[in-house]
């Protein structure tokens, strides 16, 4: 179940995800605001690529710049999703994103665990990680469909060990001290 009751988006007229056809598995997820996704090519990626390809020794600032250029952009959705403990929300790319817009999800899929919703340090807003490999910046308008969400039940192994720790934060917090 998705909701748009995030405090920072109150009164902004966000649309809850919905399926487009009777047999659709995925709920279309929209951008919560206008955002421009820069092209990796316009962010000095070509220079760094040539240095690597030609066997040049890179210095630390080159590595830092490459990491910054290839860092995904987080597109806010303004929604959060409540699920039972044995469900997960999978975020998948829309086929039109890669085919028509040169937009990819660099993590392949997004995994939204049930305990991401309203944990102590994170209200649970869902973001979609994207990377624009097209040659131009891509403008995404509020309300444009940017991903699809699929709710899936999952199983645990017979020898799964009980876990006492709870999630305390958001992105990248699983398994870190003070995170989960």
Predicted features and spans:
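DUTPase catalytic domain/fold
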Residues: 4-180
């Amino acid at each position: 179940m998705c909701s748009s009751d995030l405090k920072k988006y109150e009164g902004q007229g966000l649309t809850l995800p919905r399926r487009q056809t009777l047999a659709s598995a995925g709920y279309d997820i929209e951008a919560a605001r206008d955002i421009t996704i820069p092209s990796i090519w316009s962010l000095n990626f070509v220079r760094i690529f040539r240095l690597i390809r030609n066997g040049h020794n890179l210095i630390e600032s080159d590595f830092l710049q490459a990491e910054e250029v290839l860092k995904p952009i987080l597109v806010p959705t303004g929604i959060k999703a409540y699920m039972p403990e044995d469900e997960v929300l999978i975020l998948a790319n829309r086929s039109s994103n890669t085919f028509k817009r040169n937009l990819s999800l660099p993590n392949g899929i997004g995994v939204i665990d049930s305990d991401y919703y309203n944990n102590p340090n994170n209200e649970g807003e869902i973001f979609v990680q994207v990377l624009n490999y097209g040659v131009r910046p891509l403008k995404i308008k509020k309300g444009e469909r940017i991903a699809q969400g699929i709710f899936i039940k999952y199983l645990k192994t017979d020898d799964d060990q009980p876990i006492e720790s709870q999630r305390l934060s958001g992105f990248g917090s699983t398994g870190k001290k003070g995170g989960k």
